[in-house]
Amino acid sequence: MAKGVREKIKLVSSAGTHHFYTTTKNKRLKLEKLELKKFDPVVRKHVIYKEAKIK
């Protein structure tokens, strides 16, 4: 069976609350790091989430 192209990543909140989302991205097509605006339930606001590696 072939190895998958998608890689698991963690999106960490830039608000400093240590809240994160997990998702996957195509590592062959998207070489730059993801930055998405998502809801942070700790501060109850939409903030920027930046990509980090899952350890």
UniProtKB/Swiss-Prot annotation:
A biological-process GO annotation: translation
GO cellular component term of the entry, any: cytosolic large ribosomal subunit
Keywords in alphabetical order: Ribonucleoprotein, Ribosomal protein
Pfam families per the UniProt record, alphabetical: Ribosomal_L33
MF term (GO), any: structural constituent of ribosome
Family listed: Belongs to the bacterial ribosomal protein bL33 family.
NCBIfam families the record matches: PRK00595.1, rpmG_bact
Protein name: Large ribosomal subunit protein bL33
